[in-house]
From Swiss-Prot:
It comes from Salmonella typhimurium (strain LT2 / SGSC1412 / ATCC 700720). This is Adenylyl-sulfate kinase. It catalyses: adenosine 5'-phosphosulfate + ATP = 3'-phosphoadenylyl sulfate + ADP + H(+). Belongs to the APS kinase family. ATP binds at G35, L36, S37, G38, S39, G40, K41, S42. It holds the Pfam family APS_kinase. The lineage of its organism: Bacteria, Pseudomonadati, Pseudomonadota, Gammaproteobacteria, Enterobacterales. It comes from the Bacteria.
Length: 201
């Protein structure tokens, strides 16, 4: 916290989270997709957002690459920068969930501690950790951006899964098999959202 924090006061507003959720017709939550590069995080999150949008659900997808074009464009890939990247995304996701949106985030977010901090910021009742579990060998075969090839050749350092660690979730709320069809995974997630009374249809 900064030194001037004693002069910064939280202001409550008359429009509550519950009122916003009532307007949207569903709860505001954060769906946090985590997994290796190439695991299918962004693909599944994008397909789920499309399915929710077709059902009239208010959503927003925060993608790991996209936020580095603006919100996090000043950050690199050191451990400190990765931590700050996730902290910023967590803050934005929390604000969007407060606005009543279903926020989908697709980030490697390799460290458990960082994901836990986001969970605490968002609130345990509004944070759903979704682990897209895809074997490293499959991720390397997919390699949509050619990053694994560069990492194996020594052209890309500190790459998660090769020379930087990925800490898989101990007990994610959702554990997806990243080798399954995307349509099957989306169906599983829609069922979960219905069971938890996050969406109605």
């Amino acid at each position: 916290m900064a030194l001037h924090d004693e002069n910064v006061v939280w202001h409550s507003h008359p429009v509550t989270v519950a009122a916003r959720e009532q307007l949207h017709g569903h709860r505001g939550v954060v769906l946090w997709f985590t997994g290796l590069s190439g695991s299918g995080k962004s693909t599944v999150a994008g397909a789920l957002e499309e399915a929710l949008h077709q059902r009239g659900v208010s959503t927003y997808l925060l993608d790991g690459d996209n936020v580095r074009h603006g919100l996090c464009r000043d950050l690199g890939f050191s451990d400190a920068d990765r931590q700050e990247n996730i902290r910023r995304v967590g803050e934005v996701a929390s604000l969007m969930a407060d606005a009543g949106l279903i926020v989908l985030t697709a980030f490697i977010s390799p460290h458990r501690a960082e994901r836990q901090l986001v969970k605490e910021r968002v609130g345990h009742d509004r944070f759903i950790e979704i682990y897209v579990n895809t074997p490293l060998a499959i991720c390397e075969q997919r390699d949509p951006k050619g990053l694994y090839k560069k990492a194996r050749a020594g052209e890309l350092r500190n790459f998660t899964g090769i020379d930087a660690i990925y800490e898989a979730p101990d007990s994610p709320q959702v554990h997806l098999n990243g080798e399954q069809l995307v349509t099957n995974l989306v169906s599983q997630l829609l069922d979960l959202l219905r069971r938890r009374d996050i969406i109605r249809s």
